[in-house]
Structure formats: C-alpha cells, structure tokens
Swiss-Prot record:
GO terms for molecular function: sequence-specific DNA binding. It comes from the Bacteria. This is Nucleoid occlusion factor SlmA. Pfam families: SlmA-like_C, TetR_N. Residues 7-67 form the HTH tetR-type domain. It comes from Shewanella loihica (strain ATCC BAA-1088 / PV-4). The gene is slmA. Its main location: cytoplasm. InterPro entries: Homeodomain-like_sf (IPR009057), HTH-type_Tx_Regulator (IPR050624), HTH_TetR (IPR001647), NO_SlmA (IPR023769), SlmA-like_C (IPR054580). It is found in: Cytoplasm, Nucleoid. GO terms for cellular component: bacterial nucleoid; cytoplasm. HAMAP family: NO_factor_SlmA. One of its GO terms (biological process) is cell division. Residues 30-49 bind DNA.
Length: 197
C-alpha cells in the first residue's frame, strides 16, 4: 500500500485562508473559523503561525515572490518598452484573477482591522511594481533616444493605477468583473496615447 503524501500543514493553512477569503467576501476570518476549515484546533494553527498576522504575512510573501520573480523574467526576456509594460500589467491582472482570495489581500480589503504592518507590506509590493514600470519607461529614452512628453514617474503611476483599479473592481464585484476583461482593447488605447506623447 502506497503511503499518502505528507501534507505541508503550513501551506495547507495558507491555502485554506485564501479559499475562505474568496468564498466569504466581506466577512472577517477568525482563527476559529480557519481552524475548522483546516480541520485542526486553534492551538494547532498557532504551532505553525504565532498569530493571524503571520498567516497574512505568509500570503503576502507568496504574492511578492510570485509577482517579483515573474517581473524579473519579463525584464530579462522582453526588451520592447510597450510590450514590457503590457506584460507587467497583465501579470498583475492575471495573478489577481487566478487568485481571487489573495486579490483581497493585495487590494487591502482583507486587511481592514488587521495590523497596519500588513497594509504597508502590500503597499511596498505596489511600490516595487511601480519602480519597475519607471525603469522600463526610462530605459526607452536610453535605448531609443526618445522619451515621453510626460515624466516617466507620472506615467508609471498612471499605469499602476489602471491595474490597481481593475483589481479593486474585481474585489468590489465579489469576483464577477474579471480584471483581464477588455484589457487587450484598453491596452491598445493606452499604448497609442503613450506613443503619441
């Protein structure tokens, strides 16, 4: 008889937390509810995570690692400025769409009433993404000798705001309004405007 694979309890707890965030929008997740979902006692939860804040930090670590590692791939593999920007924004939107519960953490919705440090961490993720966008836009000037009529920092902020807005709509609609819906058409318009500037 084959032995069943050992469950990584820590990962299982985080998966259950993400699922609960997806299936219970607008509701506060308590450790008692999470323990029941995982099928363990609250004490067992605390053996793996010293606090609920640490559980959310585990999800934030997953978000940061997933996004930044893929952004680095985009930066290494793609050299065209507009394509890089498109892929980076698309990455954010697809990630949120594929991980609805986690998108509530990214958006900050699930962190209301939690430790301020958690909201700061998600803010730092968006700051890192914005820094990458600024770098991409500034490199256009270096590579092509022609920049934009508007400061790259302002443009990077605008592009990030588009993605953040789509994620916020997704969360607000209880995951009905997909962040990637109409993105191709929207990107075409945005790209035209950027290239005209």
């Amino acid at each position: 008889m084959a032995a069943s694979p050992k469950i990584n309890r820590r990962e299982h707890i985080l998966q259950c937390l993400a699922t609960m965030l997806e299936t219970s929008p607008g509701q506060r997740i308590t450790t008692a509810k999470l323990a029941a979902e995982v099928g363990v006692s609250e004490a067992a939860l605390y053996r793996h995570f010293p606090s609920k804040a640490r559980m959310f930090e585990g999800l934030i670590d997953f978000i940061e690692e997933s996004l930044l590692s893929r952004i680095n791939l985009i930066m290494d593999e793609e050299k065209d400025t507009m394509r890089r920007c498109q892929l980076l924004l698309q990455l954010l939107l697809v990630f949120a769409e594929r991980n609805p519960g986690i998108s509530r953490v990214l958006n900050g919705d699930a962190l209301l009433g939690e430790n301020e440090r958690l909201r700061n961490r998600t803010g730092q993720i968006f700051s890192k993404v914005e820094t990458h966008l600024k770098q991409i836009l500034r490199e256009k000037t270096l590579r092509e000798g022609k920049g934009f009529n508007l400061d790259e920092a302002i443009l990077a902020n605008l592009l990030l705001a588009v993605a953040e807005g789509r994620i916020a709509q997704f969360v607000r609609s209880d995951f009905k309004n997909k962040p990637t819906e109409h993105f191709a058409e929207q990107w075409q318009f945005i790209q035209q405007q950027l290239l005209q500037s």
